[in-house]
Amino acid sequence: MQKSGIFILNKPKNISTYQLINQVKKKLNIKKVGHCGTLDLLATGVVICLVNNATKISDYLLNANKAYQVKIKLFTLTDSYDGEGNIIQTQIPFDISLDQINKVISKYNNYSYEQYPPIYSSIKVNGKKLYQYALANQDVEIKSRKVTIFKTKLLNYDQKNYEIFLDVKCSKGTYIRSLAIDICKDLNTIGYVVELNRTLSGNFDINSAIDIKDLSWKHLTSIYDAVKINDFKVVKYHNILDVKQGKKIVLNNIKDQLVFISDEQNNILAVYQKYENNIFKVKRGGLNNDIY
């Protein structure tokens, strides 16, 4: 019988998230493997790998906020907004002061706005990914999405090499490549992402992430610990049979709209949602089914 849980992986550069997940599957001979959000090919950092029954809670972990460190090269623009693309525009460098940069950066603190994703992205329009339109040189309407930038901090400004190094905390769905373009526009210039490292996904930190070459079953985080780490409400329920059968249950003095139900051994059994008053109904069950 195989265990269920998550691995906190540190994705290296130049492999896709899909390739990384496949490596996990083959290395540990796991039947069901998923993830909580892709990273660009050139990006590095935290990827949450879901194993077996943990794949059933992907939506809850996927909605988590993220944090990144990003290096932006000024005065050059690529079609993909990163180093993987082709250069489509250059600009004669001009002086941008540290004060100017700090003034622009300060705008992106607790800032919500309509962001346009890059054409080279996996967002689907009419059943087709945006990058497929780009590769086929086809026109497509790109719709904006509301995102929130909670905090942006300037880590370094390399004036000699025209590079800005930032720390960004943002909501799910934020494209850092698009954010880089927007920051450059505010500086009256162009730019692209040369380095991108995801340092946080929910409460999973880069310092806890494992390189694929070092990965083993000992690095598995249980579903129980994963949901606790991310501040979800966990309730131990006395009648396990009712939960396994997907029946409505009564939970008193619970303010949360969503709760994870566990047994006395800290096995997460199901996700329940508030139905009315103190009655909860099952939203996702079968989280403790055996995988062979």
Swiss-Prot record:
Listed GO MF terms: RNA binding; tRNA pseudouridine(55) synthase activity
InterPro entries membership: PsdUridine_synth_cat_dom_sf (IPR020103), PsdUridine_synth_N (IPR002501), tRNA_psdUridine_synth_TruB (IPR014780)
Under catalytic activity, the entry for this protein gives: uridine(55) in tRNA = pseudouridine(55) in tRNA
Disulfide bridge partners, by residue number: none
* GO biological processes: mRNA pseudouridine synthesis; tRNA pseudouridine synthesis
Q: What is its EC number?
A: 5.4.99.25
- Active site at 40 (nucleophile)
Which keywords are on file for this protein?
Answer: Isomerase, tRNA processing
Instruction: Write out the function statement from the record.
Output: Responsible for synthesis of pseudouridine from uracil-55 in the psi GC loop of transfer RNAs.
Can you say what this protein is called? tRNA pseudouridine synthase B
